[in-house]
Amino acid sequence: MSTTSVIPKHWVDKGPWPIMTTPQGEGQDTNSHYSVFLATDMCHVHNLFIRAMNSVYLQCPYVTDQADIADLLFYTKTLVITIDAHHDSEEKYLFPELAAYTKNPKIMAVNQAQHAAFHGGLEKLGEYCTTTSPADYSSVTFRAMIDSFAPQLFKHLNDEIPTILALKQYPSEDLKTIWTKTEQHIDDVGSFDEMFPLAFGCMDKGFEAGQHKFPPAPFFMEYVVRYWFARKHSGAWRFNPCDMRGNPRQLLFIPTEEDQKP
């Protein structure tokens, strides 16, 4: 049964960077070719990055307590690591496999160039989050660092989807085999008690009328993440725009209308 999320008044879908519509959401059949399935799944991954980045960008000016700042910096550092891990898996496994299979070494050249365009700025943000003490934190500096690479990052996240859909010219099963090889390496990177809580807390289960089954994990995984992996850094996950069940929630540090009343 389809469900639609109850979206809070001030939420990450309102920007500054818009959530992407999936090919499935546009009416394409994910069973018609693996390129449609893969492009739809890739949209979900990209959307979790967008939701997380929107969340920290919108909330950062209102985070003033030292403990809250420490959690914000940790959360953002985890986001940087997660984006890095995703793109590293593409650079090391997916892109070379596609180049070899298609006998076209430049098939993903545009995407690789886009990675390079935002990588330096993303790394500087990660370094800032790792080396800055809560006492030295500046929301102005924090936002400016995101602004320095965000246009390139979000252009890439959007541009990669039609590139994947263009792989429809190749046999569906061959593309599935290539992606399966890449997936085998994704879980090798990062800490489960960091990446999993961030990912599960940025998935809107009601997105596009609740028609998606993403992430493709067994039902009990939500409980494992919520009650086990999320415990260690629980303060950081307050910046997630959803709870661990995929329900959108009010951004904690955004002032409400009640807060702003004299």
UniProtKB/Swiss-Prot annotation:
Keywords in alphabetical order: Metal-binding
Gene3D superfamilies: nmb1532 protein domain like
Pathway as given in its UniProt record: Secondary metabolite biosynthesis
Pfam families: Hemerythrin (PF01814)
Domain of life: Eukaryota
Coiled coil spans: none
UniProt region (Hemerythrin-like), positions on chain: 69-160
One term of GO molecular function: metal ion binding
Protein function: Part of the gene cluster that mediates the biosynthesis of the dimeric xanthones cryptosporioptides. The pathway begins with the synthesis of atrochrysone thioester by the polyketide synthase dmx-nrPKS. The atrochrysone carboxyl ACP thioesterase dmxR1 then breaks the thioester bond and releases the atrochrysone carboxylic acid from dmx-nrPKS. Atrochrysone carboxylic acid is decarboxylated by the decarboxylase dmxR15, and oxidized by the anthrone oxygenase dmxR16 to yield emodin. Emodin is then reduced to emodin hydroquinone by the oxidoreductase dmxR7.
Domain text: The hemerythrin-like domain might act as a cathion-binding domain since it binds iron in haemerythrin, but can bind other metals in related proteins, such as cadmium or magnesium.
Name of this protein: Dimeric xanthone biosynthesis cluster protein R11
UniProt source species: Cryptosporiopsis sp. (strain 8999)
